[in-house]
Amino acid sequence: MSDILEKILATKTEEVAAARKARPLASLRNDAETRRDIRDFAGALTRCQSAGRAGVIAEIKKASPSKGIIRPDFQPAAIAESYAGHGAACLSVLTDVRYFQGAADYLVAARDACDLPVLRKDFLVDEYQVFEARAMGADCILLIVAALDNARLADFEAIARELGMAVLVETHDAAELDRALRLASPLIGVNNRNLRTFDVSLDTTLSLLPVIQAEGRMAITESGISTPDDVIRMREAGVNSFLVGEAFMREADPGAALAHLFA
């Protein structure tokens, strides 16, 4: 595991401990279980695939540890509206505060501004965060295989599914993919960014794609998609679902950038 990932996960453990003291799990769990406003995240991507068009999970991200501030003029609601108006299937919103300058309030604002299903993009290390995700309105959570053992992967997936949420299981190599395929979720993300070196290679998705397809799962390529040629390369290989953030966040109109990239 990389130093940066270890650092982030250690921070998350501290944050959850503080959050549990501030608000007991029982209270949070009640809020999560009583929300009835779930939006079909996996279904939105499946409908795009059935229609023969790319299913884009458009990301709302202010900053990252590797790039610093990506979008100084950061208005989550306006960005969400722009994405929704230009063909995004779903949204991804960073809620990590320390490393990505995200916030739960950003997810709430983005979701309130449109009708798209929303992924909570964060580093989950505790069941508390799964209930927290649904309580804040998330329709999908991210489980990073590199960050979790098999028991927690299974537990967090089960809780999410009981709450009606979809689960995007993120992998980077064959060993992680093998572990991801033990779960029930149809959504398999392939992060083209190596979390150990932060280098990006689209070959990562292409190398894992045959196994994902053979298992009847949906491959979602993440990171490094920045040009129409990248999109063409992926689609010709059979990838129909994309998670893209930075390429849009650096443009004045993120939605217009989405429409151009996937024209």
UniProtKB/Swiss-Prot annotation:
Enzyme class name: lyase
Known EC number: 4.1.1.48
Metabolic or biological pathway: Amino-acid biosynthesis; L-tryptophan biosynthesis; L-tryptophan from chorismate: step 4/5
InterPro entries per UniProt: Aldolase_TIM, Indole-3-glycerol_P_synth, Indole-3-glycerol_P_synth_dom, Indole-3-GlycerolPSynthase_CS, RibuloseP-bd_barrel
Reaction(s) the record says it catalyses: 1-(2-carboxyphenylamino)-1-deoxy-D-ribulose 5-phosphate + H(+) = (1S,2R)-1-C-(indol-3-yl)glycerol 3-phosphate + CO2 + H2O
Keyword rRNA processing: no
Any one Gene Ontology BP term: L-tryptophan biosynthetic process
Lyase keyword on record: yes
One Pfam family of this chain: IGPS
Recorded superkingdom: Bacteria
Key words of the record: Amino-acid biosynthesis, Aromatic amino acid biosynthesis, Decarboxylase, Lyase, Tryptophan biosynthesis
PROSITE patterns recorded: IGPS
GO molecular function, a single term: indole-3-glycerol-phosphate synthase activity
Xref: CDD domains: IGPS
Family: Belongs to the TrpC family.
Protein name (record): Indole-3-glycerol phosphate synthase
Organism (species): Laribacter hongkongensis (strain HLHK9)
